């Protein structure tokens, strides 16, 4: 009896994908474009965590934050007279555990509101020239700005269908979204603090969005305006819960000081 010839798949082991050819490993630095389109990179980023609470002593906590020169902002919750939020920002996420959390634990009756916990990291899109400004300085300056005390914070999760769209379609949707935000910013109505939340939250959010402004109404109008975009109307699986508050304590931002 003749043997059946082995097929190529039977005789040759399947080849493993080649590893990324980036310095012999994976390059996790943020990428941008400098002068004349020259690639630039920076392996630094800001972690930003929002936390919601109830029944704490806001005035006492603000004093503790002041004495500790805390890299954090305290917001009074507009929906809850006893509620407040804390936004911490740092390059080393250990700062939240080692410095911010011990200050919070001094509040004996503090009630933690898990639904408002959001953690993310700043990121570059790829065309930015000044990566330190985009990733570190600008996000910190925005949340510390006393001229924009009103804030709306919420998580966003896209549907998997977005990732199946062509790169060109994704680019168009992001450009539409970004154009609206830019217009509101140029008019002085709102600034945005958007961080990536992949793998950093229990609900697997893609992004954490912070809208900041002098007044609250433009922030609501911006959310409403965004609802009409293709990305939001077709490819957002979940938005919220929304925290709405006004800053009652902010640190003074120093552009020359390096954040922890």
Write out the residue ranges for each language-model feature:
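Metal- and O2-centered redox machinery and metal/ROS homeostasis
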Residues: 70-73, 185
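Accessory, usually C-terminal, subdomains that scaffold auxiliary metal cofactors
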Residues: 191-193, 198-206, 211-260
């Amino acid at each position: 009896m003749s043997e059946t010839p082995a097929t190529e798949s039977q005789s040759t082991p399947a080849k493993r994908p080649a590893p990324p050819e980036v310095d012999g490993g994976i390059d996790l630095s943020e990428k941008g474009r400098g002068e004349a389109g020259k690639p630039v990179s920076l392996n630094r980023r800001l972690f930003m965590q929002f936390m919601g609470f109830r029944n704490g002593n806001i005035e006492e906590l603000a004093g503790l934050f002041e004495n500790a020169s805390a890299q954090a902002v305290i917001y009074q919750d507009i929906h809850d007279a006893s509620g407040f939020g804390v936004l911490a920002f740092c390059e080393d996420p250990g700062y939240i555990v080692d410095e911010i959390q011990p200050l919070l634990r001094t509040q004996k009756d503090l009630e933690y509101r898990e639904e408002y916990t959001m953690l993310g990291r700043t990121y570059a899109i790829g065309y930015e020239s000044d990566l330190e400004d985009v990733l570190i300085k600008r996000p910190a300056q925005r949340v510390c700005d006393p001229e924009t005390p009103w804030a709306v914070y919420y998580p966003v999760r896209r549907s998997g269908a977005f990732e199946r769209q062509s790169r060109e379609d994704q680019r168009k949707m992001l450009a539409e979204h970004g154009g609206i935000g830019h217009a509101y910013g140029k008019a002085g109505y709102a600034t945005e603090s958007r961080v990536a939340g992949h793998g950093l939250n229990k609900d697997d959010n893609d992004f954490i969005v912070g809208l900041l402004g002098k007044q609250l109404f433009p922030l609501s109008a911006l959310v409403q305006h965004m609802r009409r975009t293709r990305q939001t109307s077709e490819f957002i699986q979940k938005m919220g819960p929304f925290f709405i508050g006004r800053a009652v304590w902010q640190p003074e931002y120093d552009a020359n000081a390096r954040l922890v």
